[in-house]
Amino acid sequence: MPATITDHKEFQNYAINFGPQHPAAHGVLRLLLELDGEVVERADPHVGLLHRGTEKLLEQKTYIQGTPYFDRLDYMSMMSEEHAWVIAVERLGQIEVPERAQYIRTIYAEITRFINHLLFFAAHGLDVGAMTMFLYCFREREELMDIYEAACGARMHANYFRPGGVARDLPDGLEQRIRDFCNHFPSKLDEYETLLTNNRIWKQRLVDIGKVSQEDAFSWGFTGPMLRGSGVAFDLRKAEPYDAYDRVEFDIPVGKNGDSYDRYLVRIEECREGVKIIQQCLDQMQPGPVRNDNFKISMPYRQDMQQDMESMIHHFKLCTEGFNLPAGEVYAAVETPKGELGVYLVSDGGNKPYRARIRAAGFNHLQAVKEMARGHMIADVTTIIGSIDIVFGEIDR
């Protein structure tokens, strides 16, 4: 007698690997998915494939040499990563930053936010099937990369923020280029919203997908757009202002439902608020020095090194030995595009950190995938991962 389906008493779920070689994995993410048909029962993230030992490397480098390693953490938010490191060094060494340098750092922190969020819109749209967003966003992103390059000579690994200020002043004409971009960027955001915000397919793919309540967001340690998307109006730029953020006015956009759609809307509004911040900084910024005048800490100006022996000696000492910080410990955090990036820095009084601990926002967000994905279809996993906006440089470190 042929067997029938009723003869089998047990049906088992099956497991599949999502990534690490997958275009929607946003890096080297490996998810072990347990499926009941097409419904996700469990999603276990496996991390560590991009581990480079950054925290240990920082113990072997001077405080100046440590800055480029932060460019390579979240390599889509380069100057924001540097920001946390230099602020930690400045607080531990009680190093003062000139006012103009504070404004420049604030401007470039917001430009970095644009660069990151534009990539988020582009990649998230591509994950869901909206390829036009990819083309539109890279049009504006290219302008911003040129603005990056004009200030520091690099499009990605900037090494522009330094303890005590920035590497060099803005070249002639760059302030006007930034103003021009801020004048037309809101109309481009309107174009993005025309394409996506009320798009029926976009809303079907994002609304009620990956919902996170306020309580769960706090429990998982969410920060940045992930926390604000769940309705919590917390932003380090307001709560613990640094550089010029206490001198500018801006609002904190928050979501209502805590789903992928709200996280998208929060990032759109963050771009609009970033335009306001940059415009206020440009209006308030005055000519002046852009780095601390103690050349035992800050690099002397290149034109001085060509004429002054003392400046050349300072440069040689900083490049070979760096500078010493007093013994102690400090925690500094900044509001990067992905959330709170924190640096816990311990000094034993030498020219290198005794210990440097990095708190990456994306690590906490990735932990929650197993809860966010449970009960959703397998096609929704790419939406959830995209809405988190993860980069494995900072997660694996």
Curated annotation (Swiss-Prot):
- Source species, domain of life: Bacteria
Q: What is this protein called?
A: NADH-quinone oxidoreductase subunit D
Q: Name the InterPro entries on file.
A: NADH_Q_OxRdtase_suD, NADH_UbQ_OxRdtase_49kDa_CS, NDH1_su_D/H, NiFe-Hase_large
Q: What membrane topology does this protein have? A: Peripheral membrane protein
Q: Where in the cell is it found?
A: Cell inner membrane
Query: Which keywords label this protein?
Result: Cell inner membrane, Cell membrane, Membrane, NAD, Quinone, Translocase, Transport, Ubiquinone
Q: Does the keyword Cell membrane apply?
A: yes
Please list the reactions this protein catalyses. Answer: a quinone + NADH + 5 H(+)(in) = a quinol + NAD(+) + 4 H(+)(out)
Q: Name one Pfam family in it.
A: Complex1_49kDa
Top enzyme category: translocase
Q: Which organism is it from?
A: Magnetococcus marinus (strain ATCC BAA-1437 / JCM 17883 / MC-1)
A single GO CC term for this protein reads: plasma membrane
What the protein does comes down to: NDH-1 shuttles electrons from NADH, via FMN and iron-sulfur (Fe-S) centers, to quinones in the respiratory chain. The immediate electron acceptor for the enzyme in this species is believed to be ubiquinone. Couples the redox reaction to proton translocation (for every two electrons transferred, four hydrogen ions are translocated across the cytoplasmic membrane), and thus conserves the redox energy in a proton gradient.
Where this protein primarily resides, as one coarse class? membrane
Write the Enzyme Commission number(s) for this entry. Answer: 7.1.1.-
Task: Give the family from UniProt.
Answer: Belongs to the complex I 49 kDa subunit family.
GO MF entries: NAD binding; NADH:ubiquinone reductase (non-electrogenic) activity; quinone binding
Gene3D superfamilies referenced in this protein's UniProt entry, alphabetically? Cytochrome-c3 Hydrogenase, chain B
Share what the entry says about its subunit structure, partners included: NDH-1 is composed of 14 different subunits. Subunits NuoB, C, D, E, F, and G constitute the peripheral sector of the complex.
